[in-house]
């Protein structure tokens, strides 16, 4: 009887374990498929795949991971992988923007805005992963010597959510980049078509000119030389007439300028004479008054000097 109960208990536990582990497999299947696509895609996808592999390793929460999470090594490596991913993504985006030059400005701006938003979401997802690991390290260090099972469970749950969000945003970014690339290809094809449309009339004109030259080649050389001489003569006469007209205009303009200069010089001369006369009328009375004062002063000085040199009468008489 005990053996029967033991067999039933083992069967029940095995069934429970199968029910618990069963939902995990479909969850990781798209992730593995997405990882395989990244490893065979663009350089930015390869860099994101390396970030993804590192995140899967961290999510195992093995003993080695637990030890390294207590040091900044994990976050430093994640930062390096993040920077590498964003750098490759920006380079790929710049390459696509160069190919989008023939596309309309409005379309290019809209695609660029959507791609920047998707790129920002992917960067924010990776930044959340790093921030969560930094927070976990701080919490573990604060609970040193205590049980961290609850912290590990919370971290595992957060990492699963962040990984799903990262997968979703990376897939969205891939789709938008595909649209971006399709727009670049379409723009390049439109550019080629536009060039072909512009070159078509030129080619036709060249064909017409070639036909005209061929027909002219059949004419006698003397007739063509005579026609060319007449055209040159008419052209020279036209240029000579224009030159003479231009010279006449220049002469008239020079005469007008000379007349204006002479008139201005005469006006300036009259103004100078009037100003000189005005100055003379101002200063002549002043000069005459100064001369009179000076003469009076000289007379007074002479009188004073004469009085001082007169002989003094003697008292002997």
UniProtKB/Swiss-Prot annotation:
InterPro entries: ApoA_E (IPR000074), Apolipoprotein_A1/A4/E (IPR050163). The modification Methionine sulfoxide is found at residue 143. It comes from Papio anubis (Olive baboon). Residues 1-18 form the signal peptide. Heparin binds at residues 162-165, 229-236. APOE is an apolipoprotein, a protein associating with lipid particles, that mainly functions in lipoprotein-mediated lipid transport between organs via the plasma and interstitial fluids. APOE is a core component of plasma lipoproteins and is involved in their production, conversion and clearance. Apolipoproteins are amphipathic molecules that interact both with lipids of the lipoprotein particle core and the aqueous environment of the plasma. Residues 80-255 are annotated as: 8 X 22 AA approximate tandem repeats. Keywords: Chylomicron, Endosome, Extracellular matrix, Glycoprotein, HDL, Heparin-binding, Lipid transport, Lipid-binding, Oxidation, Phosphoprotein, Repeat, Secreted, Signal, Transport, VLDL. This is Apolipoprotein E. Coiled coil: none annotated. The keyword Protease does not apply. Pfam families: Apolipoprotein (PF01442). The lineage of its organism: Eukaryota, Metazoa, Chordata, Craniata, Vertebrata. GO terms for biological process: AMPA glutamate receptor clustering; amyloid precursor protein metabolic process; artery morphogenesis; cellular response to lipoprotein particle stimulus; cholesterol catabolic process; cholesterol efflux; cholesterol homeostasis; chylomicron remnant clearance. It is found in: Secreted; Secreted, Extracellular space; Secreted, Extracellular space, Extracellular matrix; Extracellular vesicle. The modification Phosphoserine is found at residue 147. Residues 210-290 are annotated as: Lipid-binding and lipoprotein association. Residues 158-168 are annotated as: LDL and other lipoprotein receptors binding. PANTHER family: APOLIPOPROTEIN, APOLIPOPROTEIN E. Homotetramer. May interact with ABCA1; functionally associated with ABCA1 in the biogenesis of HDLs. May interact with APP/A4 amyloid-beta peptide; the interaction is extremely stable in vitro but its physiological significance is unclear. May interact with MAPT. May interact with MAP2. In the cerebrospinal fluid, interacts with secreted SORL1. Interacts with PMEL; this allows the loading of PMEL luminal fragment on ILVs to induce fibril nucleation. APOE exists as multiple glycosylated and sialylated glycoforms within cells and in plasma. The extent of glycosylation and sialylation are tissue and context specific. Belongs to the apolipoprotein A1/A4/E family. Residues 278-290 are annotated as: Specificity for association with VLDL.
